[in-house]
Amino acid sequence: MKFNKVLGTLGLAAVLAVGATAADKVVHWRLAMTWGPTLTPFVNAPAEVAKIVKELSDGKFTIRIDASNKTKSPFGVFDMVKIGQYQMGHSASYYWKGKDIATLPFTTMPFGMTTPEQYAWFYYGGGMKLMQEVYAKHGLYSFPGGNTGAQMGGWFRKEIKSPADLKGLKMRIPGFAGEIMSKVGCTVVNIAPGELYTSLERGTIDALEWVGPGMDIRMGFHKIAPYYYTGWHEPATELQFLVNKKAFDGLPKKYQEMLTVAMRVAAYDMYIENYHMSAMAWTKMKKDYPNIKVLTFPKSVFDVLKKANKELLAQYEAKDPEFKKIIESQQAYMKQARQWTKMSDYLYLKASFE
């Protein structure tokens, strides 16, 4: 199925036109999330998918959603969907790097594409095809599940003035960025979202990155770690809908189309909701929390991060041809797309602030 062409060849109106009939199959699915039940806007994406498919199918295709407090395994989503315990999951692809390093780039890469660039790569630059090739090996499909946009660089107890300040720092930071921070001397840990504040409060970690002001402020990180750094590591963090391949392939075609369209709509809605949340929270943050010090890492730190990124990419590309193929595809697309990003967004913003 050509997932990247669903909206172009079918369209939501067409899906509505082929709604459920009395003879249609009744299907009840379950979806497991990495997130707790109140972690908006992440949890809103699966909820919207369930709502859309239920309405389009006249209640014959339903999806029950179980949050991490129900499954008791926030990072077990991959395996639960793979074995068919759940037909779907909502998580992030870079959490599965220990299972298959080729899954990692489909979330985001340090110093990589912006959100528009990455979505264009997925749907028109070959990204979806590459992603399905990787996940097919595991009996799964993966679909974009909502983007956070560029993330902030994290909350730190102390100011980072030089690369030496990273040595021995205990930090929660997932994905390829975690590999980079480990290489430059940090002790990197991956902690479930529901345990982040407690881990920071108890001193289990010295720093963490989460998302951006829209989600971070209500978590209370600023009460403990007031140094808030701008980002470099996750310029376009894409969550994912994981779908059991056998379950999806066994759906009636119209249900496949309903689900595929619902996921794409919900992913975009999550992106713009998160953007709104962060825009509103940024203004509130500067007014209500003057103790927060917004900083950018010094050039000396960026230099070592970029050097580590380059070395690690070469290392992983040498180990895994599939990983290399994905990275080369992303970099080639970004090289071309970035010319337009600079000409449009960058120069517009530069002109508007001068």
Language-model features, listed with the residues they occupy:
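N-terminal secretory/targeting leader peptides
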Residues: 23-118, 128-354
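Core domains of carbohydrate- and sulfate-ester-processing enzymes
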Residues: 123-127
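Short, low-complexity disordered leader/linker segments with a strong preference
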Residues: 1-28, 348-354
